[in-house]
């Protein structure tokens, strides 16, 4: 929106006594400034004042036991190492907590896993040592530097060393990390993966794709698990003792029995032994917290606090062994199991699933018995939100900033349908919404599985929540999701009933589930949970505009001076020839990245076997096989992730229009303009990463005409078939190409079309594009969002463009919209927001999410981050604190089209 138009709107609003320089205060006031409980607010303050901390306690005990168990069966050896690590975790209970335990001994933080990937720590070892040697200094300047990033420790200070641009580690622990990392050189999943990848004849191509950021990162050793839905059924139904007894009985039945396959039948014995070892470690971990709570009770003088510690002791001692009896016990157990799951591996996106339906049995029975009130439930859910927000994922700076933006994608799905096709909404899900409105934290993000059968008041409640500006719930088309389940998993026996059990894994990965029959106090309930492999551990983020760049540059990356692909040496005389070379390069990229990823994940499943997640999900316990042996019910989950789709579409449209249809410019003139960035500085030099505030250096006007023509060329998002058909043709082709790819489980793959935060770094690695985007600026976000400022014909024209193709045949698509808060003010505004959402989903859109925020607020927050510690925005499938986002993503969010009328 132009400054003059924005000023005019602002003056009109102010004339009516409506202030527009806010995020969502008008909408907040509608709901009487909903606030969290005093207890939750106090603990949220603890979170705000806590830095992300990395420590070596868990890895130390893991590594020590792993060495000690050398020579044992790999899966049992790993189980013993995990058992030792969990058993030795130092308990830490913050005063006022009713839900306890966390990833480490620190309130917020994580730990490195050099057995998965150690090269970063080895490479940075000397630098970290030097940082640790520096004299301690606690200057205000240093505090300000890392404070501006919220909980991120972006620079070293005092006795704290910054690692990966996010975590702080005490300097005395740094030598332990470096020493341990060196022990894993040549033996980690990462190093073994590199060793065997090099045996591929086209390994050099794979390395070129990685070094030029055409592919964002290797998933096999970076984030091998996650972007999936956890399953809490077995602990909730049987208790931990019950699972141990089950494993012991199964162990007796399978010992020495090959069961006819001659390959993995014998592995069942070792898997069941590993299950027993790990659960014993988890029980010790829980009971250590119970002992700590008992100690705190003994020294507490306040009678109310003393009673709370006593309650914690009883809860923890019970759930360490038995099925939970109450809602609070069930909530504590599911949270504990969740932390255990994400501590097992380098994981982001271990999503919670249909939580309101999973915990409903305990909620229903406690309410009926008068054991708990709705307000008490809401407070517990507020506390749960804070605990989930405390989860950090330890990864390299590139992954943390360039993909995760500090988020861990623990998505909670609401709505959808039950097994019998009736509405999945219930009273507990309404309370989950209420808790998220009162206690606005980035985690867990909510996703509404929209279905026409859901009650209107439930949907209105969700729309009210969205209006508050937290970015959630996002809205997903339940019908599309079940259709995709049936298509992708038909060969593995997917039924319509089972398809209804799906939920969102990670930020937006449609993930298969199943129904299990849970019995509580003699009453049986059907609950959903995850039943599939990682739905996001395939080829990680192909940069679509970068592939097109290399088509134009004959396979060469001029920024890096690397010949990535073999030169095609074609004159590109026709548009069809451009498309032909693009498809060839794209298929080459998928093929080599898919095979390299298969090698990495194969090594991961052999040496870093998942035990906790395996024992949780059907049908591993029934089969006696872990995830690596396809113990899960659904295994065709690995995908090909892409980024920058609309930037690519707009670029193709510009080439077609300007070079081949109108013949206004030659392909050589376009290439020259791109190499010279249309006469502008690179965004990296300027320090601004949207198209705003870029600096022109060419004074001759040589590129003015071609630059204007590129900007004026047809753009996606305006219901213009010239551009939109390019998207349609690409989507049809991409789906077929991905199905030709094969994961290590010999299953077909599929497209995953989300940007997360990759449109920032991948945009930074890309020259100017034919659509007029300048070098180093971010790509378009999502996959069907319009490029910032190019959707000129309103939101409904954008919806027409987005639904020109069948979005139900792929895992997902992503639509981000930014609305001015006054646009949806009041009850009518809530209805308007719901109608807007419905209109898109009814047209076949898969996903839509909103930022309800004034751009001026974001600009001020960028300049004065300390004044906006609690400000949250929706990025691309997830919500994050504004001050913890990198500037490229901040610039992109600010630049998004802001709709004042819908």
From Swiss-Prot:
pH dependence: Optimum pH is 7.0.
Domain of life: Bacteria
Keyword annotations: Lyase, Organic radical, Phosphoprotein
EC number of this enzyme: 4.1.1.83
SUPFAM superfamilies: PFL-like glycyl radical enzymes
Family annotation (PROSITE patterns): GLY_RADICAL_2, PFL
Ranges where the PFL domain occurs: 38-774
Domain Glycine radical span(s) in chain numbering: 782-902
Principal EC category: lyase
Notes on activation and inhibition: Enzyme activity catalyzed by the HPA decarboxylase complex is rapidly and irreversibly inactivated by oxygen. Competitively inhibited by p-hydroxyphenylacetamide. Not inhibited by m- or o-hydroxyphenyl-acetate, p-hydroxybenzoate or p-hydroxyphenylpropionate.
Temperature dependence: Has a half-life of 15 minutes at 30 degrees Celsius.
Described function: Glycyl radical subunit of the HPA decarboxylase that decarboxylates phenylacetates with a hydroxyl group in the p-position. Active toward 4-hydroxyphenylacetate, 3,4-dihydroxyphenylacetate and to a lesser extent p-hydroxymandelate (2-hydroxy-2-(4-hydroxyphenyl)acetate), forming 4-methylphenol, 4-methylcatechol and 4-hydroxybenzylalcohol, respectively. Is likely involved in the catabolism of aromatic amino acids such as tyrosine fermentation.
NCBIfam families documented for this protein: glycyl_HPDL_Lrg (NF033715)
Protein name listed in UniProt: 4-hydroxyphenylacetate decarboxylase glycyl radical subunit
Name of the gene this protein is made from: hpdB
